[in-house]
């Protein structure tokens, strides 16, 4: 079987980062689902809090895990992938065991798509389900989208550039102060995404009050996955200022983005939401979305 070694590093050199990207692409192609999140991919080339665990088999890269340390009330979160040609050798189990041990109390590991291999690793290590994230999808052709009607007192506009960033950050961090990945954003988080090839200012919608046009009430950031065939849109982030809740802004902003994506000629759209976020699930269900697959975060029993 050959020797398997694992080692941690705080920062990847360019060659190793490229090798990890190739491994992740191969795993995604083999499984039909990305093995790690967008944030984990971005961290490959960016200095930051994330740590990187590399597994080598016979001297070649065979697996990768990303670990974001615990911060505030949020436990450490890991994600892992194994090269398709190197599976069945215990590499996934070794990565998950080491990542959870390094993450400390209540550390968790994502299983994107919760595939049979991930379930087997969880069972082998005695892990429990700690969190579920649903991917929901709908066609943009049928059922027909509801009409977009902007109520009196609300202005709906698109992103005007970095001048909007302070308000965008304020609303995001207020809306997601409870969220381990989406909360606590900085200017850097927006700048990195603005530099991505998919970024389109015409697809980032902001709602303001006519009485206070400089204060953002909520936003909807859309995204297009051009690498999928056919391309698919995404309800990337919908954030509402807690002080503006109860005004129907979530539905309004979501609809604005859906109409925009349909006008771009896309046939389908996806989104991610916490399975236990009943209000969000109900809103999206009423807009024609249905669960497509589930991502599961596992933790050690008793953690």
From Swiss-Prot:
Its EC number is 2.3.1.189. It catalyses: 1D-myo-inositol 2-(L-cysteinylamino)-2-deoxy-alpha-D-glucopyranoside + acetyl-CoA = mycothiol + CoA + H(+). InterPro entries: Acyl_CoA_acyltransferase, GNAT_dom, MshD_Acetyltransferase, Mycothiol_AcTrfase. Residues 4-141, 154-303 form the N-acetyltransferase domain. Keywords: Acyltransferase, Repeat, Transferase. Acetyl-CoA 1 binds at residues 80-82. It comes from the Bacteria. SUPFAM superfamilies: Acyl-CoA N-acyltransferases (Nat) (SSF55729). Acetyl-CoA 2 binds at residues 238-240, 245-251, 277-282. GO terms for molecular function: mycothiol synthase activity; protein-N-terminal-alanine acetyltransferase activity. Pfam families: Acetyltransf_1. 1D-myo-inositol 2-(L-cysteinylamino)-2-deoxy-alpha-D-glucopyranoside binds at residues 38, 181, 223, 234, 272. One of its GO terms (biological process) is mycothiol biosynthetic process. Monomer. NCBIfam families: mycothiol_MshD. Catalyzes the transfer of acetyl from acetyl-CoA to desacetylmycothiol (Cys-GlcN-Ins) to form mycothiol. Belongs to the acetyltransferase family. MshD subfamily. This is Mycothiol acetyltransferase. The gene is mshD.
């Amino acid at each position: 079987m050959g020797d398997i070694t694992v080692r941690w590093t705080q920062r990847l050199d360019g060659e190793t980062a490229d090798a990890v990207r190739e491994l992740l692409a191969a795993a995604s192609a083999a499984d039909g689902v990305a093995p790690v999140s967008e944030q984990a991919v971005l961290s490959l080339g960016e200095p930051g809090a994330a740590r990187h665990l590399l597994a080598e088999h016979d001297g070649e890269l065979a697996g990768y895990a990303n670990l974001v340390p615990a911060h505030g009330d949020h436990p450490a979160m890991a994600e892992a992938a194994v090269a398709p040609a190197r599976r069945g050798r215990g590499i996934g189990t070794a990565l998950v065991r080491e990542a959870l041990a390094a993450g400390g109390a209540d550390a968790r590991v994502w299983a994107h798509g919760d595939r049979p291999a991930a379930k087997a690793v969880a069972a082998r290590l005695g892990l429990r389900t700690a969190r579920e994230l649903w991917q929901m999808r709908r066609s943009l052709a049928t059922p027909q989208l509801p009409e977009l009607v902007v109520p009196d007192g609300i202005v709906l506009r698109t992103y005007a550039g970095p001048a909007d960033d302070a308000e965008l950050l304020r609303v995001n961090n207020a809306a997601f102060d409870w969220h381990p990945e989406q909360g606590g954003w900085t200017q850097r988080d927006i700048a990195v995404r603005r530099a991505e090839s998919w970024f389109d200012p015409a697809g980032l919608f902001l709602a303001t009050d006519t009485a206070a046009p400089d204060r953002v009430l909520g936003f909807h950031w859309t995204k297009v996955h051009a690498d999928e065939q056919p391309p698919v849109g995404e309800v990337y982030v919908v954030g509402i200022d807690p002080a503006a809740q109860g005004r129907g802004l979530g539905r309004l902003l979501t609809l604005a983005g859906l109409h925009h994506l349909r006008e771009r000629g896309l046939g389908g759209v996806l989104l991610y939401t916490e399975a236990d976020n009943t209000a969000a699930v109900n809103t999206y269900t009423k807009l024609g979305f249905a669960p497509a697959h589930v991502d599961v975060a596992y933790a050690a029993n008793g953690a």
